[in-house]
Amino acid sequence: MASYKGILAHTNKWEGGLVYHKNEGQWTNRGIQWTTFKQLAPRLINLPSPTVEDLKALTQGQWEKFVEYFWNKATYNNAINDQAAANIMFLALWGSGSYGIRDMQKAIGTTADGIVGPITVQKINANKKAAEILYQALDKRYRLLASVNPASYSQYLKGWLNRLSELKPDKIAAISIGAIAAIGLIYYLATNR
């Protein structure tokens, strides 16, 4: 079963810090926009009247609650089995909201309503190539956004693609195989001396 803890380091790496986006007219801290923070902070981190200063002072623990919230929305409360597929669903929601999820749903062959539910999860879990299909769909989405609206999005394309490339399914599989091999080697060395 996939876990939001599997995406924390990746998201932490790519969501560097505090930025004021002039074109949006709002602050973003570690990937969380002010409008999102204002809406969710009362529920997620018990801030009844959040301020921009609260967003600027966001702690690691508070930030992780937002990541977990979006993970659960992207994976139907952690129901996606494959970590690679779940990571891409999270990235689609984290960066593009329900529009990103709709594109993932279209790619996987289910109704594109922007809400991950049992039918979307079943389609993902039943398809051995789901992670690769979702990866290609998100890559296509990023490239399309940058080509259709270059003034707003072309400046972000390289970063989006770099971020996505770290989630390429074959890279995740190689890391998993490498970890298993390392454990096997440690066990062998420990028991054969």
Regions found by a protein language model. Give the residues of each.
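Cell-wall polysaccharide-cleaving catalytic domain and substrate-binding groove, primarily
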Residues: 1-172, 182-192
